[in-house]
Amino acid sequence: MSQLNDSDIILFEYNFHYQNIRSKNTLDIAFGIDRNFLFGCGVAIASILLNNREISCEFHVFTDYISDKDKLYFSDLAKQYNSRINIYVINCDKLKSLPSTKNWTYATYFRFIIADYFYHKHEKILYLDADIACKGSIKELLDYQFSTNEIAAVVAERDIEWWQNRASVLTTPQLASGYFNAGFLLINIDEWNLNNISSKAIEMLRDPDWVSKITHLDQDVLNVLLNGKVKFISEKYNTRYSINYELKDKVDNPVNDDTVFIHYVGPTKPWHEWADYPVSRSFLIAKAASPWSKEDLLKPV
């Protein structure tokens, strides 16, 4: 049974529905963010809508903070693209005691709330980190069919040397065959909940023995729990690139014409004023085609 009960977690819900009748063939896409990612999340949604006008998508944003201005922008975005956007303001008290780092706050655990919340509501949810920009079609994800016992479709992170490192550190030998990045999760909601993944993950994150091993918080935990129950799909759906790499003399940029989602890992994000590099272009195009078009990029503080 889930430790994240709806009545305890969801404080407020705001629905901006400008597609009057939800299509039967709709892809539900969810984000879990704190206030620092509201700007990025809005533009991420705009980028998906901009590149997938022929697909019906409904968006779900789980956050612990939203201002009236933010609500207006998300409403305007839904209206602009004749779409449906839902904002859920959540109580994070049960998550704040879990491990966190400078780069990963308790907001990283919102994906557990998301996967539990949609049980008996939707069969499939695409969870995305908010520091992404879409530049291609996601129709294959809309049409994706899970195989028996498959809990999620995922994208591998890095290379076999990294997988072997994770397998050793996390005392899970099977991870040597593949370790995924949790910024993209196409989740089979029924299988996730039948396997009690969220509850098991929280238990592990409260276990000192496990906490001493993990370095990538819920990503490490999910790799252990979902081991053998995921399908690895194309890197084009989670093409990771750190804008900080641009400071190097030579950089290998994996983003290409086939890339669907650029995932801007690392501390510098495309909404930062100093992220003025070609790789930020997909984000800036979507920003210009959204209610955030006149918002300044963030300056150094």
Predicted regions located by residue number:
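Histidine-anchored nucleotide/phosphate-binding helix
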Residues: 35-52
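Active-site-proximal specificity loops/subdomain of glycosyltransferases
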Residues: 70-117
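Short aromatic/hydrophobic "clamp" motif used to bind/position activated sugar donors
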Residues: 125
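Short internal beta-strands
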Residues: 57-65, 153-155
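Catalytic metal- and UDP-sugar-binding loop of GT-A-like glycosyltransferases, i.e.
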Residues: 128
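Conserved donor-nucleotide/metal-binding helix-loop-beta segment in metal-dependent transferases, i.e.
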Residues: 132-166
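A glycosyltransferase accessory/donor-loop signature
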Residues: 1-33, 182, 187-301
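Short alpha-helix within the catalytic core of nucleotide-sugar-dependent glycosyltransferases
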Residues: 72-75, 120, 135-147, 198
